[in-house]
Amino acid sequence: MAFTKELWQSIEPIYAAILRHPFLRGLTDGSLPRESFKFYAVQDALYLREFARALSLAGAKAPEDDWIIMFNEHAAGALKVERSLHESFFQEFGLTHEAVASTPMAPTNLAYTSYLLAVAYGRPFHEALAAVLPCYWIYWEVGKELERVSSADPLYKRWIGTYASEEFGSVVRAVLAAADQVAASLTPLEREAMRRHFITTSRYEWMFWDMGLRREAWPGW
């Protein structure tokens, strides 16, 4: 069995909880409050900037030239997606680039990105790869599932299409192939470290959608 399949089996309960989450169900049935989606989209833009940094750090540690290229291209791609959010969603919300950039990170967002950067900076390549993998893989699987159900809301349908696309699928498959190739030469302890990071950041994926639904804020004092 491919190692990535083992990884996925380890998060099946988390993924099932993600699909049941009211945020995602609200995207398909149109019941998600616009303010929750707006909050999520702004936090996602802030997340993508830090995710790009984590990808660049992972690329710097990659043992294969093709992976160095791949992760640096993906880092650039994450920043392009962040910019496209301004063009496709934030203008509709009346948000300027400055307004988004000056928005504080919500607690969950700060915790998630801090974890990613700590692993990407301080741990070996295989661990960094495992930590960033859920953001790719879970979004692709969620996108495909939500596209199957679709949405009557044009705005939410557009968001769903971004992550269900074959173009994004090709990106994810390349990262999965790298993870399997790396894991093949690792010790059981090294693979277990990959699994721990993969599970942790998968949990953060659930928490991120929950953060968006609740419009999570820091305490007021």
Q: What are these regions, as identified by a protein language model?
A:
Residues 1-24, 166-177:
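Acidic, low-complexity proline/glycine-rich segments
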Residues 12-17, 32-61, 80-81, 130-140, ...:
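Alpha-helical bundle segments that constitute or directly flank the non-heme di-iron/ferroxidase center
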Residues 23-29, 116-118, 181-188:
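Short, charged/polar, low-complexity loop and linker segments
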Residues 62-67, 187-188, 192-195, 220:
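Structural helix-adjacent loops and short alpha-helical linkers that scaffold large soluble proteins
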Residues 66-170, 199, 203:
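Active-site-proximal alpha-helical scaffolds that flank and shape metal-associated catalytic sites
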Residues 156, 182-186, 221:
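Polytopic alpha-helical membrane-helix bundles and their juxtamembrane interface segments
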Residues 194-221:
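Acidic, carboxylate-rich catalytic segments that either coordinate divalent cations
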